[in-house]
Amino acid sequence: MAVVPLPFDGGNTGRAGLDLGDAVVGRIVVCNVYKEGYTMPEFNAVENTLFIPMLGRIYASEHFQNILYDEKALSLKDMLPKSLMETGSQNQYTLLASASRSANMDRYIRDFLRRKPDGIIAELGCGLETTFYRNDDGHTRWYAVDLLDVMDYRKTLLPEPERQTYFAGDAFSDDWLRRIRIDAPDAPVLVTAGGLFHYFEEETVLALLRMLQNFGNMEVVFDSVNKSGMGMLRKKYMKQMGHADAKMFFYVDSAAALARKIGCDARAVAEEPYYLHIDKTGLKLSTKLSMNVSDRFCMVKMVHVK
């Protein structure tokens, strides 16, 4: 599941003009993907967004390996229909926004495993993410959590690896947490939630973050927008793209304030602009400007809490 920030270059109109709203607004591309011999289930509006990150990872891997190289995503390209690969509704910025999330998550995961070599990675709303394949070190245990329909489809493209456990269920319940603690009672855990929390009310997200505190030795990293960014998402994005059925709610103005709302001794470890660590070499001027505007006003950010 994913939200991608939009550029301010006028989309496909060729018109350039600075619009701060467009620097954070996302496009949802609803696609049907079929594997031979498999009928894809009907996904709801939120589930349908799982295809956007795959397109971004493939695009970056083909054109901007300095941002992200994803061999597994490339290997799946020929299994996807041409209709999905026709990215006319997106542009360089929207595609690289998805790839940038993956690059950011990789950085946090690798840092966590350097600090906690016995740690576990749990991906919430994993969709068709290929994070495991980019970061597998040969011994770390991974868990991937998503809804049943999504997980069933994921298995057709990405069969369950030896060191990654697929868990079909509600990311906001404690079932997957209990499973992890049965398997590894005391191991440190990094929970990642890429492009997920936007779709849920604040109290729902806070309930999950508080629940993590109850299971001990847990950290969570996720991407978010700030209040002004969310306002733009609601005002422009849904009406423009005709996807009002995929509503968005959760935003973070201050990671420190979020930690106080969580309570339970939670603390904000990091809050950083989304594109801070992204190599912008070779990008179009409009893409660079969009990234710079987003970072200047902290419209999109990475948040790390434990």
Language model: regions and residue ranges:
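A conserved beta-strand element that flanks and buttresses the S-adenosyl-L-methionine
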Residues: 191-192
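Short alpha-helix
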Residues: 247-271
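Rossmann-like AdoMet
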Residues: 31-122, 126-169, 180
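A short, conserved alpha-helix within the catalytic core of class I
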Residues: 199-211
